[in-house]
Amino acid sequence: AFCNLRMCQLSCRSLGLLGKCIGDKCECVKH
């Protein structure tokens, strides 16, 4: 598995968060 940054950002944006790839994981962080 690998992190797709664009998909990560989109899914996090719907939560009002910023998407970042950490290794192969998507992390949602506050702006």
From Swiss-Prot:
GO terms for molecular function: ion channel inhibitor activity; potassium channel regulator activity; toxin activity. Expressed by the venom gland. Two disulfide bonds are the minimal requirement needed to produce a nativelike and bio-active conformation in this toxin. The third disulfide provides an additional contribution to structure stabilization and can modulate biological potency depending on its position and the structural regions involved in biological activity. It is found in: Secreted. Disulfide bonds join C3-C21, C8-C26, C12-C28. PROSITE patterns: SCORP_SHORT_TOXIN. One of its GO terms (cellular component) is extracellular region. The record marks A1, F2, M7, D24 as: Interacts with KCa2.2/KCNN2 and KCa2.3/KCNN3. Residues 6-9 are annotated as: [R/K]XCQ motif. It comes from the Eukaryota. Pfam families: Toxin_2. The modification Histidine amide is found at H31. Keywords: Amidation, Calcium-activated potassium channel impairing toxin, Disulfide bond, Ion channel impairing toxin, Neurotoxin, Potassium channel impairing toxin, Secreted, Toxin. Belongs to the short scorpion toxin superfamily. Potassium channel inhibitor family. Alpha-KTx 05 subfamily. Blocker for the small conductance calcium-activated potassium channels. Shows the best affinity for KCa2.2/KCNN2 (Kd=0.2 nM), followed by KCa2.3/KCNN3 (Kd=1.1 nM) and KCa2.1/KCNN1 (Kd=325 nM). A mutant [R7diaminobutanoic acid] has been developed that discriminates KCa2.2/KCNN2 (Kd=3.8 nM) from KCa2.3/KCNN3 (Kd=2500 nM). This is Potassium channel toxin alpha-KTx 5.1.
